[in-house]
Amino acid sequence: MAKIVFLDEYSLGDMDLSPIKKLGEYVGYDRTSKEQVLERCKEAEIVICNKTLLRAETLRALPNLRFIAIAATGMNNVDLEVAAELGIGVKNVAGYSTSSVAEATLTFALSLFKNTAYFDHYFKGGAYAATEDIFHFGRPVRQLRGSKWGVVGMGSIGREVARLA
C-alpha cells in the first residue's frame, strides 16, 4: 500500500478525508512547519499539501516520493521544475473554486466602484444623521450604466468574471 502523508489537513476544514485514507497507509498532520517537512515525508510516496512549501532541496531528499497532490488551485508552493526533473507527478484541484472566486471578484469590484465601505462607515458612524445636507459629496456616486471595465488575465477565473460581468 502507498504511504500517504497530508501535511496541512487544517486547510480543508471539516472535509471528510476517509476516501483518501482508504488508499494506503495514511498519516495526516494538522499543520507542518518547514522544519518538520523532511522528517514527516521521508518515507512517503504520496504527499498532499495545501500551503506547506515543498522546495527543491526537500524534493531531492525524498527518494520514495512519486506524487504530490496540492489541495488548492495554486501551485506556487511546490518547485514544479525540480519535481518534473525527478519524475514526481504534481496535480492541483484546478477549477474547484472558479465560480466562487469570480463572484467574489465581481463583489469586490462593485464595492470599490460604488464606495460601499466608505458609505457604510459614513452612515453607520452617524455622520449622515448629524448633517443637515440631503446629499453627501465626499465620494463620487457612480452608475454602472455606460461604464466599461477590463479583466486582466483570461484564465478560467478571468473568463468567468468576464462572462458574469
Give the label of every model feature segment.
Residues L53-L65, L80:
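Rossmann-fold NAD(P) dinucleotide-binding segment
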Residues L86, A94-K148:
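Phosphate-binding beta-alpha-beta segment of Rossmann-like dinucleotide-binding domains, i.e.
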Residues N76-L86:
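Rossmann-fold NAD(P)-binding glycine/threonine-rich loop
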Residues R40-C41, L59-L62, L144:
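A short, aliphatic-rich alpha-helical micro-motif
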Residues M1-A44:
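N-terminal glycine-/charge-rich "phosphate-binding" loop or analogous flexible N-terminal tail
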Residues D30, A71-A72, I88-S99:
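Short beta->alpha connector loops at strand-helix junctions that form conserved
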Residues P19, F135-A165:
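Rossmann-like dinucleotide/phosphate-binding beta-alpha-beta segment
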